[in-house]
């Protein structure tokens, strides 16, 4: 990629750099979704992107299977783009942000590795580590299933108090 030659053809040169950082990538994805961005990118939805994310994940697996690590770098970028697009759409809809995704993932990694970040004994084998992950995941899912009932009960209690005055 010859940046100098490419710049001659580009009207919007603020996005052209020799090397990009994370913040640049986020700005590019944001620009693509704007009304003056890309007509295809700006009209994508959660639903319309499902096939894209599945295809990109399959291409990552294929690159690993073929031990094609040059292509793997590109395919990981394509998969990351899908994540960033989903997060950008969510932010537009005021559902969550990329920072929320990062925060939730970091918390999950710490929670599911009490043998690394907590006071549990360190796993000695990969199998033990996976067992810890699965156990904590199961505990989280059980807790999550009980939370809606707790929330519903908390809503009903004030209503019952009002009704019975």
Where does each model-flagged region fall?
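Flexible "arm" and connector segments at domain edges
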Residues: 3-6, 10-75, 81-165
């Amino acid at each position: 990629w010859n940046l100098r030659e490419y710049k001659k053809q580009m009207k919007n040169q603020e996005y052209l750099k020799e090397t990009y950082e994370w913040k640049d990538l986020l700005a590019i994805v944001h620009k693509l979704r704007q009304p003056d961005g890309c007509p295809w990118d700006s009209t994508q939805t959660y639903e319309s992107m499902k096939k894209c994310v599945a295809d990109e994940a399959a291409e990552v697996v294929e690159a690993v299977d073929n031990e094609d690590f040059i292509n793997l770098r590109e395919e990981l970028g394509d998969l990351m783009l899908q994540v960033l697009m989903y997060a950008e759409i969510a932010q537009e809809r005021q559902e969550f942000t990329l920072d929320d995704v990062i925060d939730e993932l970091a918390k999950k990694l710490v929670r599911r590795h009490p043998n690394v970040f907590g006071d549990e004994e360190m796993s000695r084998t990969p199998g033990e580590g996976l067992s810890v992950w699965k156990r904590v995941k199961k505990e989280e899912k059980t807790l999550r299933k009980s939370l809606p009932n707790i929330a519903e009960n908390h809503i009903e209690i004030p209503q019952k108090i009002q009704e019975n005055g």
